[in-house]
Amino acid sequence: MAENIENNGCSQRDSAEHEGYAKARRSFNLIWKERGSAQPKLLEAILHKDNFNRAYKRVKANKGAPGVDGMTIEEALPYLQEHQQELTNRIYRGKYTPSPVRRVEIPKPDGGVRKLGIPTVIDRTLQQAITQQLVPIYEPLFTDGSYGYRPNRDAKGAILKIKEYAEQGYTYAVVLDLSKYFDTINHEILINLLRKNVKDERVVQLIKRYLKSGVMENGVVIETEEGSPQGGNLSPLLANIYLNEFDREFLKRGVPCIRYADDIVLLAKSRKASERLLESSTRYLEEKLKLTVNREKSRTVSVFAIRNFKFLGFALGRNRSGIYVRVHAKSWEKFKSKLKELSSRKRCQSIKPSLERIKVYARGWLNYYGIASMKSNMNDINGWLYHRIRMCVWKQWKCVRTRYRNLRVMGVPKDLGWKTANSRRGYWFTTHTVVMNMAMTKERLINSGFYDLATAYQSVHVNY
């Protein structure tokens, strides 16, 4: 089935004869009289067949679970092909009501939960169509210090910017923690911010309906008087629009501000200056933007503090060569813990699938953290993982005869092979013996699918 939504010519909407379109223009006339502005065409651009098709393909690529109506992404295509004109007409007439989002709770590393709101596939597609038209409007308005949910910007760019400022003497950071940011965005403030740059009031009203669509939890729809639930395609952009006021305010004050979504760092050249910044920034966020700053987690700290400065999993260090990006200790701990889980003897009953799982996880981790300086650490953890895999192989061989036979195939002399095969030493001890070093070389394991972390790191890090 073709992935284009339109089935029988959505371009009819662009014609003056389109019945729904004509009704739509009449029904929105009151809005324009109240606003006193010319009728812009942003809603038409959002609902244009090309933009809507692109939005659906993006939603399909992102996959995701069904919303409250239970409709899957695969089921949405034939539905849209049949009903898109009806959907479009309802939006133009101002009669479209988004469905409530489905509440999903995701465990957080700190023991809490992150509440997500999953819209229906139809609403996700429409939200994506809106986002695609709003991004070109807002991108020029966002500051250079904003890195989250933006084209060609990422966490690596954010930590590199902090490093750049640190090299200029900004070595004290104000780390701000917002409590339940997405769930506490003030609707009135956000709508007023949107009206500054979105001149098509129909679009503003449509976004407002999404904000007010409600949340279904345990079969009960709960009204949403504040917040923009995480999980929708539009929420990241709205979150950036809201905090852009904070970014621009402190940019005007000459304060370096680095932000990734709701992770905020302000930089100063002295501890006293950072303490003043903590007070003024907290006051602005709480009084002007009606947000809640978590005062227990928000703090001032040196950017070189070994454990206390952490931003997006990264930290900074310095030596005789200068300032460098490093992986924070907690991020290292999580990495090693996950590798330990993937290479456990219980998980490694079949070696090749286990090696593939380790490869997929480690490659993703390195693509994110590869910017950091960690050659020595990576060599250490690579050696540790190498022995973990050998331990799994040794356990998989189980009986003495299998161990002896495989050791002989790998070139181990008879006497050493027999002695090792009969050893009652533990798995970990055995993997460090001369015989095992002789038999299960790193090259042999690599040929079997072992992902050499040290080599992979070097190939990734060289790009930085």
Specify the residue positions occupied by each region the protein language model found:
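Core structural elements
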Residues: L47-F52, P100-R102, P109, Q349-Y369
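Extended C-terminal regions of large enzymes
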Residues: R388, W397-Y464
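Non-catalytic, polymerase-adjacent accessory regions of viral genome-replication enzymes
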Residues: M1-Q81
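Short, solvent-exposed helix-loop connector elements
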Residues: E223-E226, Y324, K340-P353, W365-N377, ...
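A conserved non-catalytic segment of reverse transcriptases
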Residues: K212, K288-E356, Y361-R363
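Amphipathic alpha-helical blocks
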Residues: E75-P98
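Conserved polymerase palm-domain catalytic core
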Residues: R90-E105, P109, L141-V303, N308
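Short secondary-structure subsegments characteristic of cysteine-rich extracellular domains
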Residues: A372-K395
